[in-house]
Amino acid sequence: MRTLWIVAVCLIGVEGNLFQFAEMIVKMTGKEAVHSYAIYGCYCGWGGQGKPQDATDRCCFVHDCCYGTVNDCNPKMATYSYSFENGDIVCGDNNLCLKTVCECDRAAAICLGQNVNTYDKNYENYAISHCTEESEQC
């Protein structure tokens, strides 16, 4: 299932939220988003289960929780307005649903940037079958 996220990002091209989120990640972490975060830990990528493995994975867990609060639009496909100003991400949509999705992505990208030093190559391409501990609540 998580491999579908990679395919979706590639197929979306310059359209859609996943591309926008990937662009935010690159800006905030300096890492290539798909290679570094599409299949990382228990939560970075499509879906998620178990306990986040480190602070980087926790950013993705919180992002999943944030997407869970979104109503009235598909957070993985919604296209929103945003810009980069003075090293920060600024969400600029008037539509509440799109602004919420943008803010979820913004917070996750900032979190990943703040925790880039916790990134552990051992969690790249991490098998979801290792994510067996009980998940915490959002």
From Swiss-Prot:
It is an enzyme of class 3 (hydrolase). Expressed by the venom gland. Residues 1-16 form the signal peptide. The active site is at residues 63, 105. It is found in: Secreted. Disulfide bonds join 42-131, 44-60, 59-111, 65-138, 66-104, 73-97, 91-102. One of its GO terms (cellular component) is extracellular region. Binds 1 Ca(2+) ion. PROSITE patterns: PA2_ASP, PA2_HIS. Its cofactor is Ca(2+). It comes from the Eukaryota. Gene3D superfamilies: Phospholipase A2 domain. Belongs to the phospholipase A2 family. Group II subfamily. D49 sub-subfamily. Snake venom phospholipase A2 (PLA2) that exhibits high hydrolytic activities and shows strong preference for the anionic micelles (dPPC with deoxycholate) to the zwitterionic micelles (dPPC with Triton X-100). PLA2 catalyzes the calcium-dependent hydrolysis of the 2-acyl groups in 3-sn-phosphoglycerides. This is Acidic phospholipase A2 Drk-a1. It comes from Daboia russelii.
